[in-house]
Amino acid sequence: DLGGDGFTALLLNRYQSGSVGRLVTVDDDGEEIASLDVAEEVRDVSACGRYLSVLYADRLVVYNRQLQAYATLHGPEHTREVLTRADGSVLMIGADSAELFLP
């Protein structure tokens, strides 16, 4: 899910493949709240409540709707998907297990 409370997250990329893109949050009227240039692979994005989680190849970053980093976890190597919860915690889902990240 890419929708949080009063915002939606968008991951924009100019090319079909590649890792250069832009992470954008927009409000319910479609107006931009914040944006962040992304120069690396994004594996998954999830939003809920006031938080947005982005899984990069080497770390998990939890942002607020203004795309300010709230928490970072380095090295979740086996995580394939993330599920952000309303309290800012993130369920990190792997092929055969899941862990809860509590910032």
Identify what each model region corresponds to:
Residues 1-5, 37-50, 76-89:
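Repeated scaffold domains used in trafficking and secretory/extracellular systems
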Residues 1-15:
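Extracytoplasmic beta-rich ectodomain segments of secreted or membrane-anchored proteins
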Residues 4-7, 31, 50, 95:
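Intrinsically disordered, low-complexity regions
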Residues 10-12, 54, 92:
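Residue position within the beta-strands of beta-propeller blades
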Residues 17-38, 58-76, 97-103:
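Surface-exposed loop/turn elements that mediate protein-protein interactions on large endomembrane-trafficking
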Residues 19, 48-49, 56-58, 86-87, ...:
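Short loop/turn segments that connect beta-strands within the blades of beta-propeller domains
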Residues 45, 52-55, 62-63:
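Structural recognition of beta-strand segments within beta-rich domains
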Residues 81-103:
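Hydrophobic, glycine-enriched assembly/anchoring segments
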